[in-house]
């Protein structure tokens, strides 16, 4: 039985990368999870750099046939990765990397000293392959490794967070009578991911209602604050603009609480310009659970969301007020919801993701 060693970031904390890794590791490919699994998985959790030496010893002692490595997009993390690459090279180990983001090439070409840049080009060239999240992100590794060794495996929606067909039917039926539509922000609270933009949309809604209009939207936020300054900004903006009746913060959600939010909300907003962005799983989850998408033409997002087809895809010239007005005038939510649901079930379900990864592990 083929042995595969995961060198990756496992939860906690939970984010797009760790979620994808956990889904794959706990899949039916793993013989410890499923007796019919085709592979023996082992893991080296590189989330905590304090375990660096211990992790190097684990890697050096591993008898795995293939090392599956989710690489970093920071200079410090990359130094760790270079040491791991060198160790695998010295031991003549096969290594397949998976980039869960879109910033790596910019990091290497623009942010690194010459020696570190050269070390990356040299290390990547010797790999068995490099996986990216979408077609438009293949350019990240072009010129670093042979084109036929650059592969695409899109993210997926975990089965546990995908509403059933019956639940979607009920959601569509309820839409006919919904006077106030819920807009969902579900991500980590990082300024460049765009949560201030969504707060501005909430402010625009309040101003319209104050001028005599009926309330049309309520804004639901969920996710983790990594910095106290982000939490202060969020809470201060709500208080200063009197948005208490327009904004609800649900904290960090998971399990049934998350499913209920996905069921309740009809619009998903992630106007991100986050430098490390790849292909946000949260957007796929929203589409799969029957939501109209508001996002940007950033990183690998245009590969999954098309303006006017799946929602609103904004360039850098858009502002929150213009986006809000466009949403206000959108009267075909039903069609977007049905279209987005079909797309995810066909191309981005958990089984499809695992099937693609199985093919690479077998090769």
Per-region residue spans from a language model:
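Conserved acidic donor-binding segment of nucleotide-sugar-dependent glycosyltransferases
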Residues: 307-318, 326-331
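A charged, aromatic-enriched C-terminal amphipathic alpha-helix characteristic of glycosyltransferases
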Residues: 331-362
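Conserved donor-binding/catalytic core segment of Leloir-type glycosyltransferases
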Residues: 5-7, 168-203, 220
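Short hydrophobic beta-strand element within catalytic cores of glycosyltransferases
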Residues: 288, 292-295
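Nucleotide-activated donor-binding/catalytic signature segment of Leloir-type glycosyltransferases, i.e.
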Residues: 231-253
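Acidic donor-binding loop of glycosyltransferase active sites
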Residues: 263-277, 291
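Glycosyltransferase donor-sugar binding loop
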Residues: 186, 217-233, 251-252
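Donor nucleotide-sugar binding/catalytic pocket of nucleotide-sugar-dependent glycosyltransferases
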Residues: 120-166
């Amino acid at each position: 039985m083929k042995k595969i060693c995961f060198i990756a970031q496992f939860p906690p904390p939970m984010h797009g990368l760790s979620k994808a890794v956990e889904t794959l590791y706990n899949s039916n490919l793993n013989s410890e999870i499923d007796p019919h699994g085709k592979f023996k998985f082992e893991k080296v959790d590189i989330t905590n750099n304090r375990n660096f030496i211990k992790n190097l010893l684990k890697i050096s002692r591993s008898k795995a046939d293939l090392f599956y490595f989710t690489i970093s997009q920071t200079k410090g993390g990359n130094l760790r990765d270079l040491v791991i690459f060198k160790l695998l090279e010295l031991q003549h180990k096969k290594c397949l990397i998976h980039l869960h983001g879109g910033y790596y090439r910019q990091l290497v070409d623009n942010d690194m000293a010459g020696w570190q840049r050269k070390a990356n080009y040299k290390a990547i060239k010797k790999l068995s392959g490099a996986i990216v999240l979408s077609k438009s992100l293949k350019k990240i590794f072009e010129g670093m490794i042979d084109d036929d060794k650059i592969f695409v495996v899109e993210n997926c929606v975990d089965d546990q967070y995908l509403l059933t067909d019956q639940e979607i039917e009920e959601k569509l039926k309820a839409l006919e009578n919904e006077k106030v539509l819920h807009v969902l922000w579900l991500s980590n609270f990082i300024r460049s991911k765009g949560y201030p933009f969504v707060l501005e949309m909430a402010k625009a809604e309040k101003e319209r209602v104050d001028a005599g209009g009926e309330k049309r939207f309520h804004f639901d936020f969920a996710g983790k604050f990594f910095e106290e300054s982000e939490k202060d900004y969020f809470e201060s903006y709500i208080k200063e603009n009197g948005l208490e009746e327009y904004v609800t913060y649900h904290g960090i959600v998971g399990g049934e609480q998350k499913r209920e939010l996905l069921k309740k909300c009809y619009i998903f907003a992630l106007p991100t310009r986050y430098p490390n962005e790849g292909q946000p799983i949260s957007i796929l989850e929203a589409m799969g659970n029957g939501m109209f998408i508001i996002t940007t033409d950033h990183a690998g997002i245009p590969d999954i969301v098309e303006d006017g087809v799946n929602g609103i895809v904004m360039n850098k010239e858009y502002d929150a007020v213009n986006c809000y007005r466009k949403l206000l005038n959108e009267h075909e939510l039903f069609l977007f919801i049905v279209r987005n649901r079909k797309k995810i079930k066909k191309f981005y379900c958990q089984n499809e993701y695992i099937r693609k990864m199985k093919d690479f592990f077998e090769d």
